[in-house]
């Protein structure tokens, strides 16, 4: 089983997931990951949800999940029962730039939360209709519908990632702006300019 966070990285850039897999012994969290851990607390996330209008009926935090279907496991930040929306998977991130960013360039974050939702459904038999992406820095909550197309996209992505990594295939590079700040740029594309902070 691979970590759900690897699916998020694969959606962002397949090579990031590949390097996480092959360089696993030397893999270290990035600075934004460490900063996110420092400011994350259940009370903070709960407060953001409530200030966003959530009526939390029941809650569970740091929920271990696994999905045989997806070949993934991990720990969801939270699962809450909300008064009108039902069961929601909560994923906290250091920063979410905007709703538009989340649904375009930040879609990898949605895929991570949706993978946790599918694992929750498989493990516990619940039905999850919504995801809540919580932005810690600006105290905002973004609600995402677990649509049939999102479910299909996550299953397809997990299948594609697992096949690629099981076969040991290095995905082709996709040079772009995100490469400048990637923690694997020195291994993947050593010719990329050495500027920007690591992702």
Curated annotation (Swiss-Prot):
PANTHER family: CRISPR-ASSOCIATED EXONUCLEASE CAS4, DNA REPLICATION ATP-DEPENDENT HELICASE_NUCLEASE DNA2. The gene is cas4. The keyword Metal-binding applies. It comes from Aeropyrum pernix (strain ATCC 700893 / DSM 11879 / JCM 9820 / NBRC 100138 / K1). GO terms for biological process: defense response to virus; DNA catabolic process. This is CRISPR-associated exonuclease Cas4. CRISPR (clustered regularly interspaced short palindromic repeat) is an adaptive immune system that provides protection against mobile genetic elements (viruses, transposable elements and conjugative plasmids). CRISPR clusters contain sequences complementary to antecedent mobile elements and target invading nucleic acids. CRISPR clusters are transcribed and processed into CRISPR RNA (crRNA). This may be a 5' to 3' ssDNA exonuclease. InterPro entries: Cas4_exonuclease (IPR051827), CRISPR-assoc_prot_Cas4 (IPR013343), PDDEXK-like_dom_sf (IPR011604), PDDEXK_AddAB-type (IPR038726). [4Fe-4S] cluster binds at residues 13, 179, 182, 188. Its cofactor is Mg(2+); Mn(2+); Cu(2+); [4Fe-4S] cluster. Keywords: 4Fe-4S, Antiviral defense, Exonuclease, Hydrolase, Iron, Iron-sulfur, Manganese, Metal-binding, Nuclease. Mg(2+) or Mn(2+) required for ssDNA cleavage activity. Can also utilise Cu(2+). It comes from the Archaea.
């Amino acid at each position: 089983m691979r970590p759900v966070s690897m699916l998020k990285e694969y959606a962002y850039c397949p090579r990031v997931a590949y390097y996480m897999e092959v360089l696993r012994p030397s893999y270290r969290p990035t600075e934004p990951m460490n900063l996110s851990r420092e400011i994350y607390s259940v009370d903070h996330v709960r407060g953001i949800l409530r200030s966003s209008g959530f009526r939390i009926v029941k809650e569970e935090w740091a929920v271990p999940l696994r999905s045989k279907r997806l070949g993934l496991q991990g720990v969801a930040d939270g699962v809450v029962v909300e008064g009108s929306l039902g069961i929601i998977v909560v994923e906290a991130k250091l920063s979410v730039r905007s709703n538009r960013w989340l649904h375009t360039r930040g879609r990898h974050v949605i895929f991570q939360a949706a993978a946790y939702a599918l694992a929750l459904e498989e493990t516990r038999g619940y039905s999850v209709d919504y995801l809540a992406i919580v932005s810690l820095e600006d105290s905002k909550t973004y609600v995402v519908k677990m649509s049939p197309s999102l479910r299909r996209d996550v299953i397809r992505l997990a299948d594609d990632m697992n096949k690629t990594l099981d076969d040991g295939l290095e995905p082709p590079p996709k040079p772009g702006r995100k490469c400048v700040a990637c923690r694997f740029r020195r291994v993947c594309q050593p010719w990329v300019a050495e500027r920007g902070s690591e992702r």
